[in-house]
Swiss-Prot record:
It is found in: Cytoplasm. Keywords: Cytoplasm, Endonuclease, Hydrolase, Metal-binding, Nuclease, Ribosome biogenesis, rRNA processing, Zinc. This is Endoribonuclease YbeY. Its cofactor is Zn(2+). Its EC number is 3.1.-.-. PROSITE patterns: UPF0054. The keyword Metal-binding applies. Single strand-specific metallo-endoribonuclease involved in late-stage 70S ribosome quality control and in maturation of the 3' terminus of the 16S rRNA. The gene is ybeY. GO terms for cellular component: cytoplasm. It is an enzyme of class 3 (hydrolase).
Amino acid sequence: MVEGEASSPAFTIDYAVATGDWPAEDVLRGLVERAVTAAAARTDGPLQASLSVLFTDDAEMRALNARFRGKDKPTNVLSFPAPDSMVPPGTPRHFGDIALGYETVSREAKEEGKSFEHHLTHLVVHGFLHLAGHDHETEVEAEEMEQLEREILQSLAIGDPYA
């Protein structure tokens, strides 16, 4: 497992590459920093916070999805918002954790004719928006979240992921 830390203007980002054929650490770090910085600029999240990102494989994503969502199948991204009650007074808030599954991310990018990096950036943005309280349980919520994703990705020169 490769672990490290990076900082965006408002976030300290801890990352871990557990398993999977992920790009090099510096590529992942740059991608996550750009995605988080762009998404944070468009949300009402905290001014300072920490965030953890786990790059793993479908086996671990399946286990996490089963444990926390009751769905016994792998998924591309999972988000785990940190409760505010976990923050000791005077310390930066831990915003939450994002986990990404390599095989699903890779397969989806190929099936949808997208670059792996663009699809991964989209999923980091998507996961971050979940941490910020956005959801897509209803059609209205989904439309609002997807539009926000489009705007954030456009600011990163990435095309509409839903086109």
